[in-house]
A protein has these predicted regions:
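N-terminal export and membrane-targeting signals
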Residues: 1-2, 16
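Primarily auto-inhibitory N-terminal propeptides
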Residues: 3, 33, 37-38
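C-terminal region of N-terminal signal peptides and the immediate post-cleavage residues
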Residues: 7-34
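Charged, low-complexity, helix/coiled-coil-prone segments
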Residues: 19-24, 85-90, 115-124, 175
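Intrinsically disordered, low-complexity, compositionally biased regions/tails
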Residues: 19-23, 36, 40-41, 47, ...
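Generic signal for short, ordered secondary-structure residues
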Residues: 28-35, 56-57, 61, 157
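Secreted/periplasmic proteins
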Residues: 34, 48, 99-193
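Short acidic, glycine/serine/threonine-rich helix-capping segments at coil-helix boundaries
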Residues: 39-50, 54-99
Length: 193
């Protein structure tokens, strides 16, 4: 059974990876609204709009405020994307626009970690707990927000640690992040960052 995740990363303005200037991780959020469950247009609000804005911002269709409110700037970014994708540029995310957005994403492998490591210090500060939502990456700055999608669930988490250290694996999710996504094993994921 193939498992796909959607990932979006937007770097922080203070993205140092070490020393005293490591940014505090933003709160992680688990969202059960799937991008594409409804048509999105100016005036729409919610976590699916936030995910749309994250995807557009990550691919330089912004600048956008990623706030979950489909405003004029979001509509303009959607129209720019639609024009480049050869779609009708109406600023509405519906059945034609959604698959084109998903086509932007590359497939990467993800694992998860946690049991046996709880209580250990993480590279970006703090200690790993059973409830810690986050992701390890080899090079993204600490605090970078990453949005994952799997099985109808979105989870936005910060980069909190370094890794993975297995060949061919791009992302190492904490066990809590994997649970929030319903991910039980090493999986191939779709990524955008």
């Amino acid at each position: 059974m193939a498992v796909f995740l959607v990932l979006v990363a937007a770097t922080t303005s203070r993205g140092e990876t070490g020393g005293a200037s490591v940014p505090a991780p933003a709160p992680a959020t688990a969202v059960k609204a799937q991008l594409g469950e409804r048509q999105l247009a100016e005036g729409s609000e919610g976590p699916d709009v936030r995910t749309l804005q994250s995807i557009l911002e990550a691919r330089d269709y912004g600048p956008l405020e990623v706030n979950g409110s489909f405003d004029a700037a979001t509509a303009a970014a959607v129209r720019r994307f639609q024009r480049e994708a050869g779609l009708q540029a109406d600023g509405v995310v519906g059945p034609q626009t959604r698959p084109a957005l998903l086509a932007l994403m590359r497939v990467k492998k993800a694992t998860w970690y946690g049991p046996g490591l709880y209580g250990n210090r993480m590279a970006c500060g703090g200690r790993l707990r059973r409830s810690t939502l986050g992701v390890a990456h080899r090079t993204l700055p600490c605090g970078t927000q990453v949005t994952f999608y799997h099985g109808g669930r979105f989870v936005t988490v910060p980069v909190i640690d370094r890794g993975p250290f297995r060949r061919g694996v791009e992302w190492d999710l904490t066990a809590a992040t994997a649970r929030a996504l319903g991910m039980a094993a090493t999986s191939r994921l779709r990524a955008i960052h």
